[in-house]
Amino acid sequence: MILIAHRGNIDGPIKERENTLPYIEEAHDAGYDVEIDIRLKNNKLYLGHDKAQEEVQLSWLKKRTNWLWVHCKTPETFSFFYNSQELFIHYQLNYFLHDVDQLALTSKNYIWAYPGMQPLENSIAVLPELHNEDVSKCIGVCSDYLLKYV
């Protein structure tokens, strides 16, 4: 099963550390993929769920494409990634956009399932702990509490 640290969280949310470069690296160093929130502002990329928090360079993303799940927080951000053929074709960046959609399809064709949608075969269950969901049919889990699924 693919285990994805939601904003870098592994054993419960730590809001002040979420979507920060050191926290993301710590989650990966612990052996997990990481879901990050990215937004485009003034032609620069920033980490941050509700607002632009910390600038992130494309070079940083390019070195981590095999374990990052990039949640584009705005349509403009999604369009930026979609129109960057280098990021997708050469680096195979995995990105997606969703807000309250039941499902989203990532650029690598993974089904990203909104909380409350399980059991859904071969999907990524997002925050299944919110609804005590059955993840037995999932290929992955994106959670604040990954230790529960190890």
Question: Where are the language model's segments positioned?
Answer:
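Phosphate-group recognition and catalysis centered on beta-loop-alpha active-site segments
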Residues: 1-150
